[in-house]
Each structure stands twice: as structure tokens, then as C-alpha cells.
Amino acid sequence: MDARLRHGRASLAVSFFVQGVVFALLVTRIPALQDRYGISNALLPVFLAAVPILAGVGSVCTEQLVKRVRPTVLLRCVQPAVCLALVGAGSGSALWQCAVALALFGITVGGLDASMNMLGVSLQHAYGRSIMLGFHAAYSLGGIAGASLAWVGAHWHLSLAALYGPTAVVLIPVAVVAGRWFVDQELGGAAGGVGEGAGGSIGFRLLLPFCLVMAFAYIGDSTVSNWSAKYLQDTLHSSEQLATVPYNVYMVTTLLGRAVGDLGVRRFGAVAVVRFGALVAAGGFVVVATASGPWVGMVGFTVLGLGLCVIVPQTFAAAGRHAYERHGASVSDAAIARLNVFNYVGFLVGSPLVGAIGDAWNYRGAMLVPMVLVLATLLYARSFAGKPDRYGVGHERARAVDVG
């Protein structure tokens, strides 16, 4: 059983990595998609908004599907489908083909995100210590790899089909092979005990703090991904080349923060790590908003990555843990699926919110809005506390198997 858990952990990390590559390849080549299909500037926001909306629908559907199908089975099916949807988006010739491909991408990526995090929470429960940040570190690493591939494609003027096709040819077999070692909730339950309640349903009151924190974190994240380049160039008067750097630096610091974040949770506990992350992220927004020049602004975005990176993985972990302790594994899966919707809510709200405030006032002031929302995370930080016999603050469950 120890070997199965280790294999399950490694295979799930591969799945997170693959998804990071695929998602980065899509979002970094949006201008090329617009050119390929002749999407007007007026219509482009509709296409961009449709993906997270449909991803939310996919996440809601996943909550119902996992009542009949194990998350491991669902993940094995949807990850290749996401890769194929990416290829479809880059290979069509008519606008409706792009719409169908992006719709398929949105629906399947919602199921993929939900099922990956379900398995991550289940494995963390089986391990009896924090490992969730490591999975999200693999996603960040995949995002860096995908963005690098996108740069190569743009530099060498590769068509989207020539970029996406070979990438999918490599990633789909990797995902399929990794899926052989996924570990489902039954093994997690065997290793970590059974929840206090058998069945039941998760109350919205329990999930509300985590839903708000998830939305706040993704509002901050979407601010960086959508507005960092424009802010550096238009407000801080950087060069066009330098304006492309902040998001890459943000991704690297996100990777580094997540790579060591689990150690912080084991040593200091989830509450302390979430509070620290919120304070650091808020400090990053302050530096960005008050920056005197582009290099100071880049320091702010760097600090932002170190702060925001720990919040989302810990939100999934805490919500899943609380649901499991009260109702068992199946309700934990439902909680993750519902919570996952709010990452898309944050993504949808963040970009237009900052843009509207920036246009109506100024972009320095607009950067203070996600700062305030991230600071609001401090109000809900105690919700991340586990039971005394759970991991955190130097403790691991005595009954947890030693899985390395």
C-alpha cells in the first residue's frame, strides 16, 4: 500500500504538470487564435468569458458524476479530452469550429480541475501531512513549460496546429500512462480513517469562507495575468519587452513558493501559512501600486507570487478535510467540486473589475482593490485550522502510514 500511495502521488503530480502545460499554451496564444479565426475585438471577450463559465458548469457536473464514477476514472477520461480540445482550437478554419473547441475545452477543464483536486485532497488525507502545495507546484512548472513552448512557437512562426498537435501527441500518452497509478478515495480512506459522518451533504455555511477566499485569490491572480504587462508599460513607462517579464517572474516565484510551501504547513500549520501568504501578497500589491518605476513594480509582482501561491492549494485542502471529517470521502469530493467553481468566479470578476476601476480612476488605485480582497482572507484564516491530531504545527497523525 505504501508503494501505491507513492505512485499515486507521483502520477497525480504528472497530471497537474500536463494541465499546466496545456492551459498555458491556450492562454498565451490567444492573439494567434484571434488572428486565425478573425475574431473581432468586440467578440473576443465573449469567447474568453465562455471558457471559465463552461468550466464552472463542468465542475458542477463533476459533483454529480463522481457519485457514480470514481474521480480516478473521470480524470483518466477528461485529461486526454482537454488535450484534444486544445488541438481542435488550433486546427479549425471556421469560427464555429473554434467556438465548439473552446466550449469542449471549458467543460472538460472544469471536470479536470475538480477531479485532480479531489484526488489531491484524498491523497493528502491518506498521507496525514501536507502535500497539496506540491501538486500545484507541478502545475506551475507545467505553466512555465507551456509558456516557453508558446514563445518558441511565436518566435519560429509556427501555426497553432503545428504547435498544439505535436504537444498533444506527447502529452496524451504521458497522461494515459500516469493515469494507471492514480489512487482513489477508497485507499485514502483505508489509510487515514473514516469521516465522522457517513454520507450527508455539505452545508453552504461550512464552505462559504473557503469560497470567498478562493474567489479573492483568483481575483488577485487574474489581476497579475491580465494587467501586469499593461500596468508596467502604461503606468510605469517600461519598454514593451520589459513589460512581458512580470508574469514570467510571477510564475517562477509561484513555483518556488509552492515547492517549499508544504514544509511550511507541516512546521507552522495551515492557518499561519495562509495568513502569511495573504500579508505577503497584500504587501506585493502595495509595492506595485506605489512603484516609482518598472523595476520596483517587478519586485512587487515577484512578492505577489510568493504570497498568493499558497492560498489556493490550502483552500482546497482545508475544505476537503473539513467535509471529510464531518461526512466522509464522497461529501469531500462534492465540496471540492463546488469550491472549484469559485476559482472561475474570481477569474471572471478580477480582470473586468480592475479594468473598470483603472479606466474610471487610475491603475494604481485599481491595484489596491485586489489588495483589500486578499487582506480579507485574514478574516477567514481560522477556518483553515484542522483537528489537533491532524497535520500542522509539528504534528502528523500517528495512524498515517509512512509513505516517504
Predicted feature locations:
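Short amphipathic helix-loop junctions that connect adjacent transmembrane helices
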Residues: 28-42, 226-242
